Amino acid sequence: MSVNEDLSHLGVFSVDQENLERDVTNTASEYIAHESREIEKKRLQKVRKEISSVKEKIRRLDERIDSRLTKISVKENFRKQLSKFRDTLQSLQSDENDIKRRLNNEDSANAPGIGAFSTEELERQELIRTGKVTPFRNLSGLQKEVDFDDESSIREAVIKSEGTYYETAPHLSSEPSNIDHGIIPRDEKDEYVTVDAVTEKVVTAAIDDGDDLVYRQRLNAWCANRKELRDQASASENNKDRGEFEGKDEWLLPHPSKKGQTFEGGFTIPGDIRPHLFRYQVTCVQWLWELYCQEAGGIIGDEMGLGKTIQIVSFLSSLHHSGKFQKPALIVCPATLMKQWVNEFHTWWAPLRVVVLHATGSGQRASREKRQYESDASESEAEESKTSIKLRGASSSFHRYAKNLVESVFTRGHILITTYAGLRIYGDLILPREWGYCVLDEGHKIRNPDSEISISCKQIRTVNRIILSGTPIQNNLTELWNLFDFVFPGRLGTLPVFQNQFALPINIGGYANASNVQVQTAYKCACMLRDLISPYLLRRMKLDVAADLPKKSEQVLFCKLTPLQRKAYQDFLQGSDMQKILNGKRQMLYGIDILRKICNHPDLVTREYLLHKEDYNYGDPEKSGKLKVIRALLTLWKKQGHRTLLFSQTRQMLDILEIGLKDLPDVHYCRMDGSTSIALRQDLVDNFNKNEYFDVFLLTTRVGGLGVNLTGADRVILFDPDWNPSTDAQARERAWRLGQKKDVVVYRLMTAGTIEEKIYHRQIFKQFLTNKILKDPKQRRFFKMTDLHDLFTLGDNKTEGTETGSMFLGSERVLRKDNSSRNGNEAEDIPARDRKKHKIHDKGKKVNSSKVFEKMGIASMEKYKPPQESNVTKTNSDSTLGDDSVLDDIFASAGIQSTLKHDDIMEASQTESILVEKEATRVANEALRAVSSFRRPPRQLIPPQQSTNVPGTSKPSGPITSSTLLARLKQRR
């Protein structure tokens, strides 16, 4: 029995999420193209009106110049005015020609950002995207035409950029070797090296090296084992190389039986590690080495689940093996991930001494004060806010212990791991010292330039700074600037200069009333910005580099409100609080929060009262439509042998979910949220992955959805959607990642017709806008024009299906106002052919229209007809994550809809277009020069108190308005 059939009695409507989102985004693209065309028509009318006005002025001036009554001195003045008007006319006619070309040219392949690239550049970006070369490599010396299906062609194309590798062809493929190397057993389907056989050998994997005895025991065992293998190999070779290795430390010697890979500069990936890395991971290690040689930093923005942690561990281990690990490395990460980092270092390269500066560390004195400081070091969201919660400082005794711990890292090596909160608490111990390397895991936490943690991180004294983030660009250009200002100080100039020269021109170019010069200037500035950051931002996607991952499917389950939920929802919409919100007397977010609680469970609204009410069944599952679905799903999956991750946004909802799970027969669960002791979090994760006793793992999205590896589950449920699509994406990627052996199914639950469905619509569109390529018309401003009032509506209970479901199922759906609609609501008619084709709609019924989509102006929906499944994902990937993905992110994060179509090759006779192009290029080059003049050398180590790069140390003189910039552009013209 399928899930859909099993839940049919609950009124659940299921839609495949991938197809749904593709259908919605395709419709949005059509709408945006239509809106862009309308804007161009209005722009053309405006230009033609101005041309007519200027021509009329020229005609009048000609008449007055030709008149016998006009004095000679006055005629000279008129001729000067006439010359200016003719120049203006020439510029306006140039704009008119550009606009007409854009209107006539509907071939997206001619849009800027596609045709602007040469074949060589496209091939280079394809190699970078698929993890075969680094961004610093060009195609000189590579084969210009590579058949990527041919193994020998791949080897021929990448061999000159990847260094010397002593193994044979299988290691140049996009997959790791399936050869049995003796130490780490693998089968053909294994995709992740950290298998149980390895972790069982490393008995101290979960214990860091704050206790020096632990480190010594592990190091001695590793050296003895390696030396024994070397002696065996030397004996078989008649002691051929035995004298060569005498007197050297074991970690500096090559592996006895497995070959490493050496790059230019004496950097070698040891044989202990290299055979177990994927092709794209080796490329990342090479890229990190290239950054290290430049004394620059970068952002590893690989998609979640591709092993960003492994790539850093491999690089630092290779530095140590190559004898280039001169100063200790600092790793800052969320508290939940500290033990994971320790485990990976111990598994991949035992000689590295890894110390945790945290109350959960294994130092002899840390345990005495563990309870006292766990609350101080908890990973709250305060780091992302502008006003951080003031953390309580460490006691004098613990501070002395921390000081000795940091000192030991500098005297005995090698890695210090702490949290973002710990960086602030122990800043006086960490910030004054010079570090060899610094890594910020989940580095998007410092995206706010004014936050305290961002300021602290920028004071770390090292030039080798790396950010790990699966979602490096989320909202706007200021956040992008702040991330780059950490990894490469001065690369994008100071914040005021960056906003002046890049952010404002790019933003203005996206306005509907932007002139032709402003549109092209925005494009040129964005191209310049892309070129500045692309070598230092490495982002690869699973679909491009990890094709052997199990399948992942996503379903959206639309659940009906229970009668109690619907009554509570309607009562709030008709209540006094709602009127205050609509009148602006109360915060709109208050109403949103109440409605979201009702959608989850009505008891959450008055939780404090009902929780202590006598004889009241708090959290009764029968009161929540989604909770009834959860219980049915988990019962079914228990029978089928599936294990589930169940995510919710709040701990209060987890409490109710826990109540609903307790009376389910034979369903065992564990739980982790913000209140879970940090010392227990990794143990909970490991226990769930290894122990199949637990069927369900209850998690909050913020704690359990951040960097945690939960491949023990193959089902994921997102109980309630988040405004930020990257938050839900982080959660759903916990199971679908390297190491997963089963197909993964993700279910989103939402109540039909409520605020949750509208939040989901905004998620789809926000993700759609983030993934747009430059060729698409201006999209974001259209959606920004909608207000939040449409959130406070409720779909008709009698309607079968949902607003989103209708969008997906209808072959065409026209939104229009129906004067005879019930209750005065706006409605839509479902075409008769749809009612016949889809049984979900009853004859004669009308479905409530979405005010969201009507305000957005979506006129119709085309039914999505999926092609062959094997080609769907790849084709979509190529279109949305193609060669201009970095430029795409820049425009999306700036709040731009997109640029307009332009002819990329101008004819020589079109002098007006050449002038516009020249002016746009000049403005972009001026922006580049301005940024470069404020860039400080990356080699310079700035003490914390002298750093001019820290946000807040130099404030902008004042905001520059749009009118000011428009005036400047007018003067330039």
Curated annotation (Swiss-Prot):
Keywords from the named record: ATP-binding, Coiled coil, Cytoplasm, Helicase, Hydrolase, Nucleotide-binding, Nucleus
User: What is a single cellular component term in the Gene Ontology annotation?
Assistant: nucleus
Xref: Pfam families: Helicase_C, SNF2-rel_dom
Q: What class of enzyme is it?
A: hydrolase
Compositionally biased residues, Basic and acidic residues: 238-251
Q: Name the InterPro entries for this protein.
A: Helicase_ATP-bd, Helicase_C-like, P-loop_NTPase, SNF2-like_sf, SNF2/RAD54-like_C, SNF2_N, SNF2_RAD54_helicase_repair
Q: Where in the cell is it found?
A: Cytoplasm; Nucleus
Check the record and name the CDD domains matching this protein: DEXHc_ERCC6, SF2_C_SNF
* Record bears the keyword NADP: no
Sites binding ATP sit at: D302, E303, M304, G305, L306, G307, K308, T309
PROSITE patterns cross-referenced by the UniProt entry: HELICASE_ATP_BIND_1 (PS51192), HELICASE_CTER (PS51194)
Q: What does this protein do?
A: Involved in transcription-coupled repair (TCR).
**Name of the molecule in the record:** DNA repair protein rhp26
